[in-house]
């Protein structure tokens, strides 16, 4: 009985033990089913929304990458914008000068090497831009002025671009020569007899002629030599002879080989209005710089007047010296001549100066500027045909005979003036100019016989 009872007692225990096992199996089966359903649901969610775990892992890395990009790229973009703006400024002013790129640090920390723009011409000074420019003489290798047509076209294109630009151009403040080189030429006091060119100067003689600090480096008012010539103080190089320099810088060599006017230039519309009944019959064309006045951007203690000029968003102060007997000459000549000022300088400067000197236009009736000149291989020549006046009754006075290369018989050369208070060249011309009006004839034979500029032209 006991054994049976034990067995009986053990049977329910086994039964009871078997039930949990069976229950566990059912629970595991339920858990497996629940896990499979959860896995299926999770897969559906992943398919629809994507993996949340991956998003949580990607977001920090992406945020870190963007933060690094924001910190390092901002100055780069700023530098890039600055560099682009500087390059635009350089392109705007590359024709008239070069600009300095102050942004020399690249984003990688290396120094940026400024590259020279090949197509840009060398820098020209402000004086050569708003004042009368220096003439480019023909070189011995290009005597016929036709050996390099590409250079000629390029020079003329550059000049046209200069004229098309507004006043906002290259700012620079260098005091250099504004007029062509002063070389031996006849003055108004010379006799009608032909004088030979001056003899060659030795380096010792040239070293004694030290120009004034205010004068342009290549031009200086010399003292009249024997025969009525004006001997310019030109530094002679260590090697080479004076004859070689004479061949390069002789203005009459320039005049001899200047190309003829084109059909377009010959048919230009006159820049002046028609004469009125009160207009004098004869016209007198006058140059400005070194003929009537001398202007400088350096402060002049003896300046007669000074005025500001706005040029390329920069204000420059111009100091002006008036040639002795400047006003007396104009007042006397304006009574018998139609006075026309014709300068190769920029209008922004010359027009403002004339507004100060002659505000009511009582002395100078008309004003012509650089845009009215003819550009020949980069040089500005004053073609008198643009006046629309009778050339038989027109005279031009200029300190550079190259300026009236196309009407040599109408031109009277005058010594360049800078600061000599004892100068009286303007007064010396008064009797001759008055006589031309009294004769009432073609002025060209008289001017030609008096100054004999054609005799200074080199032989064929």
Swiss-Prot record:
InterPro entries listed in its UniProt record: Dullard_phosphatase, FCP1_dom, HAD-like_sf, HAD_sf, TIM50
Residue numbers spanned by region Disordered: 1-31, 191-231
Enzyme Commission code: 3.1.3.-
Keyword Lipid biosynthesis part of the UniProt annotation: no
Residue ranges of domain FCP1 homology in the record: 277-436
Gene3D superfamilies: HAD superfamily/HAD-like
SUPFAM superfamilies named among the record's database cross-references: HAD-like
One Pfam match: NIF
One of the record's GO molecular function terms: phosphoprotein phosphatase activity
Superkingdom of origin: Eukaryota
Keyword terms of this UniProt record: Hydrolase, Protein phosphatase
Entry keyword Hydrolase: yes
Homology family: Belongs to the CTDSPL2 family.
Annotated PANTHER family: DULLARD PROTEIN PHOSPHATASE
Function: Probable phosphatase.
Protein name: CTD small phosphatase-like protein 2-B
Gene responsible for this protein: ctdspl2b
